[in-house]
């Protein structure tokens, strides 16, 4: 029997020999103990470190960031789930009607090889309690559930951890989940069934979880909710183990069907099935100890005509189940460790980058706040300077601001060319009108300067509004870029961000107005038709040479009338002058307007904004106001730091793990 320290006493006939999991093996009590000690030593070296590693990561809270290898125990109500866990752990867990397990229970079993003392520990939230007697476990778990989930019948997703260290338990960690319920009873929430399934699915959905499905032998396995849920998340059965309970309640004549299920012939699972017989309610009333129940279980299978074969195949009894679960868990851990290490590394890098967005904590001391604000403003000004110099960092699929502005300037050149081309259509009508109505004593071919002046002024005037439109386009682009930099640097400081955004807006209106004034002034000056004599003469010469070359390639046809010849001669002459002047005007306008925009909207805008930001440092009384963080920023930074700390510790532990 088990004494107050959880030890198996000599009165138990099967206690002379223990399996690796610490449970009695009647068949092996005459074997030599020396090989066993050697095997136990190897087992301890390989098994315990693996389980301890995952348990330590779970204790760090790493499971909040990514899934850890685990065995989750699920079953319908009254499936015998609690009895299986009791048999494995050697301690009594809460029992009763309705939902008994109301919080996920992490059951950490640690086998002690060189100690006889039983030790237990319950921990949840910020509470931790050492337990010295196995009989206290049930009460403490019930207390923990009441604290977390309330006194009623509700459930909670919050974990309770129970650690049991004893020579008579296997090295194993299990997560016990609430039993599946269908109908709310008593003071249970009306949607208790949905809540329970949602909690169970949260665990069994993870690919890192081995699902341990507890099913009574005396029900149709195809109708059990637990197995159905496991099949939904693991249709191939790769990570599901079936546990058949209550074989003593099977109707006579149906034993062969149970054997077929246990031998994986009915509902196939790659990890197979195990069958166990745990303490029933009558055994508990008769005060049958867990150790005595294990011996009764073995006797049951040895003497049963149908189920004996399952014992011989290693598919029956709690000790065999413990060995299988430990073996499966270790294999699963070793298989997932490389992936887990990569996931932790990737998460660590991702959170490190995310934390950079939130910057450092605001200092408490006033003089430190000044340096902190200076550092923030200097970083902002550096980013603004990089932007106006065309040296800012951009992503792979992004373009620098100056590249976008240059594209607008290129469009401007195209607009100038298009406007001049469209203007030529009006020239024919202008000259024809002059020739037919207003030509006086002038001989054919003499250009009327006034006509030339009117045409060129009108063409240039039509470019004024497109130039102003381009100014507004570029201004909006620069303002948006400055605002993005402000958000990147000051997003967590609402007042500082709002102040900076206000400065960006005010300076924009001021300089955009000045730039527009300069552009309109330029177009007013362009209404004076002027070009340096030598510059114009060279331009006219180039045009005439080009026209002469084109004429050589054409056949000269005689005109039918003098009037047509007169118009042609006038057109040819005025076109040459228009093209010559247009070349010089185009050079001036296509370059000077972008220069005005660059000066006011990029250089002056950026410089004035940087000076305005530095002026914020002059008023020390506003430091606290400017550096007041958004309500959620500090919490988010703290949350990210905690995650980063967890993952950093996890990386160190994985690095030290011998593998």
Swiss-Prot record:
Keywords: Acetylation, Antiviral defense, Cytoplasm, Endoplasmic reticulum, GTP-binding, Immunity, Innate immunity, Membrane, Nucleotide-binding, Ubl conjugation
Ranges for region G4 motif: 245-248
Region Bundle signaling element (BSE): start-end pairs: 339-364
Ranges for region G2 motif: 100-102
Region (G5 motif): 277-280
A Gene Ontology term for the protein's cellular component: plasma membrane
Chain intervals for the UniProt region annotation (Critical for lipid-binding): 552-555
Region Middle domain, residue ranges: 364-531
N-acetylmethionine: residues carrying this PTM: 1
Annotated positions binding GTP: 75-82, 176-180, 245-248
Function: Interferon-induced dynamin-like GTPase with antiviral activity.
Domain topic, free-text comment: The C-terminal GTPase effector domain (GED) is involved in oligomerization and viral target recognition.
Identification of the protein by name: Interferon-induced GTP-binding protein Mx1
Gene: MX1
């Amino acid at each position: 029997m088990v004494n107050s320290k959880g030890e198996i006493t000599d009165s138990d006939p099967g206690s002379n020999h223990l399996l690796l999991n610490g449970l009695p093996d009647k068949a092996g009590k005459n074997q030599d103990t020396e090989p066993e000690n050697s095997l136990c030593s190897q087992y301890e070296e390989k098994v315990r470190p693996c389980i301890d590693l995952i348990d330590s990561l779970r204790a760090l809270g790493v499971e909040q960031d990514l899934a850890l290898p685990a065995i989750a125990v699920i079953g319908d109500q009254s499936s015998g789930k609690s009895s299986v866990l009791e048999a494995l752990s050697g301690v009594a867990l809460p029992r009763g009607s309705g939902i008994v397990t109301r919080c996920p229970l992490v059951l950490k079993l640690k086998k002690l090889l060189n100690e006889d003392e039983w030790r237990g520990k319950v921990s949840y939230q910020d509470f931790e309690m050492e337990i010295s007697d196995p009989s206290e476990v049930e009460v403490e778990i019930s207390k923990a559930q009441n604290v977390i989930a309330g006194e009623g019948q509700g459930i909670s997703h919050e974990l309770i951890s129970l650690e049991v260290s004893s020579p008579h338990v296997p090295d194993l960690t299990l997560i016990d989940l609430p039993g599946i319920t269908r109908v709310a009873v008593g003071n249970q929430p009306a949607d208790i069934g949905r809540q329970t399934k949602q909690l169970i699915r949260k665990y069994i959905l993870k690919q890192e979880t081995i699902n341990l499905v507890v099913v009574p032998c005396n029900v149709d396995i195809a109708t059990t909710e637990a197995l159905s849920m496991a099949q939904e998340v693991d249709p191939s059965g790769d990570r599901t183990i079936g546990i058949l309970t209550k074989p003593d309640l099977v109707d006579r004549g149906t034993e062969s069907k149970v054997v077929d299920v246990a031998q994986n012939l009915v509902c196939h699972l790659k990890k197979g099935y195990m069958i166990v017989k745990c303490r029933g309610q009558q055994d508990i009333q008769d005060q049958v100890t867990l150790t005595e129940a294990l011996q009764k279980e073995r006797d049951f299978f040895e003497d049963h005509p149908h189920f004996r074969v399952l014992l011989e195949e290693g598919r029956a009894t709690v000790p065999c189940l413990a060995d299988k679960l430990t073996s499966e868990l270790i294999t699963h851990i070793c298989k997932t460790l490389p992936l887990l290490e990569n996931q932790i590394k990737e998460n660590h890098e991702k959170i490190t980058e995310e934390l950079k967005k939130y910057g450092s904590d605001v200092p408490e001391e006033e003089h430190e706040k000044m340096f902190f604000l200076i550092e923030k403003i200097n970083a902002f000004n550096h980013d603004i300077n990089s932007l106006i110099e065309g040296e800012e960092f951009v992503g792979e699929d992004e373009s620098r601001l100056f590249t976008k502005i240059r594209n607008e300037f290129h469009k401007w050149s195209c607009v100038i060319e298009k406007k001049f081309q469209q203007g030529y259509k009006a020239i024919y009508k202008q000259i024809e009108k002059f020739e037919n109505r207003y030509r006086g004593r002038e001989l054919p071919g003499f250009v009327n300067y006034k006509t030339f002046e009117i045409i060129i002024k009108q063409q240039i005037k039509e470019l004024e509004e497109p130039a102003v439109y381009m100014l507004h386009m570029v201004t909006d682009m620069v303002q948006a870029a400055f605002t993005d930099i402000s958000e990147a640097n000051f997003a967590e400081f609402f007042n500082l961000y709002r102040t900076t955004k206000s400065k960006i807006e005010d300076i924009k209106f001021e300089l955009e107005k000045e730039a527009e004034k300069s552009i309109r002034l330029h177009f007013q000056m362009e209404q004076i038709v002027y070009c340096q004599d030598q510059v114009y003469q060279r331009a006219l010469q180039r045009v005439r040479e080009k026209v002469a070359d084109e004429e050589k390639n054409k056949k000269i046809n005689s005109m039918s009338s003098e009037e047509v010849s007169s118009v042609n001669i006038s057109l040819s002459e005025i076109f040459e002058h228009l093209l010559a002047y247009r070349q010089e005007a185009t050079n001036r306008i296509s370059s000077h307007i972008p220069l005005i925009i660059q000066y006011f909207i990029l250089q002056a805008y950026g410089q004035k904004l940087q000076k305005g930001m530095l002026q914020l440092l002059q008023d020390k009384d506003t430091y606290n106001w400017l550096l007041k963080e958004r309500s959620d920023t500090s919490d988010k930074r703290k949350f990210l730091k905690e995650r980063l700390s967890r993952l950093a510790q996890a990386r160190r532990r994985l690095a030290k793990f011998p593998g």
